[in-house]
Amino acid sequence: EDIKDEKDKVRNKVVDVSSKMNTGAKYDSKVFKKTVGLNGVGIKAVNALSEYFHIQSIRDKQEKSIEFSQGQIVSENPISQSSNENGVIIKFKPDENMFGNYRYISEYIETLLRNYVFLNSGLRINFNGNKFFSRNGLLDLLDEKMNAPGKYPIIHLKGEDIEIAITHGNQYGEEYYSFVNGQHTTQGGTHLLAFKEAYVRTIRDFYNKNYE
């Protein structure tokens, strides 16, 4: 349905993305190739399974906030003008009838959020007062993971659909952090195998030698 009123459009978008199915990023072909998940189900599931869920969206100097309980709208504030930067604030409390004695594993969550900012340089995330930000993407990730200076400055390559950061250290063995569509692929995959093969082949071709 074509929404003519701009305020209704803003309001409906906030409601749709947080509570209605089939409104995820995968319905935009330009975003689909770089996103992970299933049709935006995640935020809807959190909303439906929370006794308190509050979403506040700030975009293009307009602000909209809505409060839900178990996926149903409880209250909402009218669209207002805002001087804040574009972004989204989400607060929620899981439904104790569903989860009982739940607890958050902060270390796990913070690792996920840290990866998100490395993969989306310039993105700022505030989680319970802890701020996560990366200006240089995977270069910052590799710099943080290294326990000692590398043998040479980190090589950082970034294209439209690929980003690579690589260096060598003094430790024995190899360590990789690979990602696809914003998801940390802890078990590797064909993307990692292809990179390793191309890397070794390039060195062989450059020096015109074969290495085992």
Regions found by a protein language model. Name each.
Residues V17:
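Short basic (Lys/Arg) and small-residue
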Residues M21-S29, I203-N210:
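Structural motif corresponding to the C-terminal cap of alpha-helices
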